[in-house]
């Protein structure tokens, strides 16, 4: 890609510096010089070691675990850039934390996804670039442009190369009713049929698989979702496909590998042969499982950043 010298600058916090470096590599530019650290009392500080006056600045920072620290790093860096007279600031948030708190599920609940949107805007962000928001309506929580990239083209390319034309006995599976639209779009691109696992969630981070909708008997199934958190939903869905549905095998893919708590242990002990994830969240404990495979998002984000900088449509990236 074209290098734009001082006119475009990419900075990052501590959440995923390797992704930021890879994005810069594909863009043909270097990562901006900065320091993001903490004082002795835990307060976060940001120091910028190069001028950003008038520059089109992109800050790469996933708000993954530790969520609050990474979010504060992002907000403080945006504020520092704004006060340093950056021309435009784009918050590049490959994984947007707090996205699951997008509505009032019960009385007196906060809508934290909206609060985070307000904080990013107040800090000085001029636009947001993210990927596979857990709830697409979060785009409407902002009064600034939000580009929500889709991760499924990366998975489509991966599985097309992996299985080639041998897709007759394969089926895409939505792990719950709420993910049907996302899984259907993925299945259509792979020219596969769709099945659904109907589940009833008893409490947060636990679920009970109830029924398999669709004939998966003897099929090789690909479960498709936007994230893997504790792995409970994923592993229960996979077990249901084998036990209740009679599936031949199960693999899975998801955009965001949160992998909190017992997730990796559950995956290792499950019937799932492979879990393909995108590296929107830095793969910290992935080495503990040979079933987890990471696919790079840097090329897609680099192209999106180039297009935003050049004021060119990015709609092509959503197809």
Describe each PLM feature range:
Residues 1-319:
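PRPP-associated nucleotide enzymes
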């Amino acid at each position: 890609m074209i290098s734009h010298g001082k006119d475009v600058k990419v900075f990052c916090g501590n959440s995923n510096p390797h992704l930021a470096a890879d994005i810069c590599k594909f863009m043909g530019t270097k990562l901006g010089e900065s320091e993001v650290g903490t004082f002795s009392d835990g307060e976060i500080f940001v120091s910028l070691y190069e001028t950003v006056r008038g520059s089109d600045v992109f800050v790469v920072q996933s708000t993954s675990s530790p969520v609050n620290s990474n979010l504060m790093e992002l907000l403080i860096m945006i504020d520092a850039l704004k006060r340093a007279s950056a021309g435009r600031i784009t918050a590049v948030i490959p994984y947007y934390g707090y996205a699951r708190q997008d509505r009032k599920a019960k009385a007196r609940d906060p809508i934290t996804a909206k609060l985070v949107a307000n904080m990013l805007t107040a800090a000085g962000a001029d636009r947001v670039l993210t990927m596979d928001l857990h709830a697409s309506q979060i785009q409407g929580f902002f009064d600034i442009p939000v580009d929500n990239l889709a991760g499924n083209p990366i998975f489509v390319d991966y599985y097309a190369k992996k299985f080639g034309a041998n897709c007759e006995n394969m089926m895409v599976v939505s792990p719950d009713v709420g993910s049907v639209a996302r899984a259907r779009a993925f299945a259509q691109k792979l020219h596969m049929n769709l099945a659904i696992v109907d589940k009833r969630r008893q409490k947060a981070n636990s679920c009970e698989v109830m029924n398999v909708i669709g004939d998966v008997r003897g099929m090789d199934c690909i479960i498709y979702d936007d994230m893997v958190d504790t792995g409970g939903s994923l592993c229960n869905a996979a077990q249901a496909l084998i036990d209740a549905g009679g599936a031949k095998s199960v693999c899975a893919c998801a955009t965001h590998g949160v992998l909190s708590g017992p997730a990796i242990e559950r995956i290792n002990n499950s019937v799932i042969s492979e879990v393909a994830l995108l590296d929107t969240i830095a793969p910290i404990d992935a080495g503990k499982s040979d079933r987890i495979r990471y696919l790079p998002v840097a090329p897609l984000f680099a192209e999106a950043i180039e297009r935003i900088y050049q004021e060119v449509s990015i709609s092509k990236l959503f197809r």
